Regions:
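Gly/Pro-rich turn-and-neighbor structural signature
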Residues: 31-76
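Long, solvent-exposed, polar/charged low-complexity segments
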Residues: 1-17, 21-23, 40-46, 53, ...
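N-terminal low-complexity, intrinsically disordered segments
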Residues: 59-62, 68-79, 84, 185-186, ...
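Aromatic- and glycine-enriched beta-alpha-beta binding-site module
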Residues: 70-129
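Short histidine-centered catalytic/ligand-binding loop motif
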Residues: 31-34, 38, 109-110, 118-125, ...
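Phosphate-proximal small/polar/acidic motifs at interfaces that engage nucleotide phosphates
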Residues: 27
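Surface-exposed, charged, gly/pro-rich loop-and-adjacent secondary-structure segments at domain edges
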Residues: 117-152
């Protein structure tokens, strides 16, 4: 079927789940709504996005609704969002999720360890590469994107306080995205267009990271750099 949006019951499910996240409430109240109003439309959206971005192998993949709580103090059994992703390279790709605040779409770089972060910081400090990334993120910010992701609260070791790209150097991960809130657009095909446009707009960011080898290298080729 063709993707035609998410009904109002979809974000409302996550509003209700935040207030009562239990296996019993899921079985009695939420599972059927999840399958019909969240999972099914997200699968339709994934098919359309996979076709549009067909140059990336593997297609868009959906996450399941159950949380892995083994290493978490929070034992709530179910996720409060429905996510889907398309990887361009390991630790680099596109993301979309639906939650109680609507739809969020982004491009993200999420390295596994210190070697990738060290290479990222070297690329940002390099004048041409750093200036290019600053320009990309400035354009995205001007289009309503938020440049988020895990980052240091202070400065990386050895970086002066007055460095022109200090904010970028603080990043250990990058998530550049924007949100479509609940409303008529979320319940129509416009939601799919929003995600496609968002992913197209973040391509330069992903291309920048891919061109500089900021994704995990084969095991025998990994450096020992450890960022601070």
């Amino acid at each position: 079927m063709t993707f035609s949006g998410f009904p109002p019951s979809a974000p409302r499910l996550y509003e209700e789940l935040a207030a009562g996240n239990s296996k019993e409430s899921w079985r009695l109240r939420h599972r059927a709504v999840y399958e019909s109003d969240v999972r099914a439309p997200m699968e339709e959206l994934a098919v359309e996005l996979s076709a549009h971005f067909a140059e990336y192998a593997g297609g868009v993949r959906l996450l399941g609704p159950v949380r892995d709580t083994r290493m978490s103090h929070d034992k709530s059994p179910y996720k409060t969002y429905q996510g889907a992703y398309l990887d361009v390279l390991p630790a680099l790709g596109f993301w979309v999720h639906l939650d109680r605040e609507g739809l969020y779409a982004s491009g993200r770089w999420y390295p596994y360890g210190g070697a990738e972060v060290a290479r990222y910081r070297a690329a940002v400090e390099e004048e041409d590469g750093g200036a290019e990334l600053a320009g990309i993120t400035a354009r995205l910010t001007g289009l309503g994107f938020t440049i988020g992701g895990d980052r240091l609260a202070t400065r990386p070791r050895g970086v002066p306080a007055g460095h022109p790209r200090l904010e970028l150097l603080r990043h250990r991960k990058i998530d550049a995205g924007r949100r479509l809130g609940p409303g008529p657009a979320l319940g129509s095909a416009a939601a799919g267009a929003f995600v496609r446009e968002t992913w197209e707009l973040v391509r330069p960011l992903l291309d920048w990271a891919a061109a500089r080898g900021l994704t995990p290298r084969p095991r025998g080729d990994r450096g020992a750099d450890t960022p601070s």
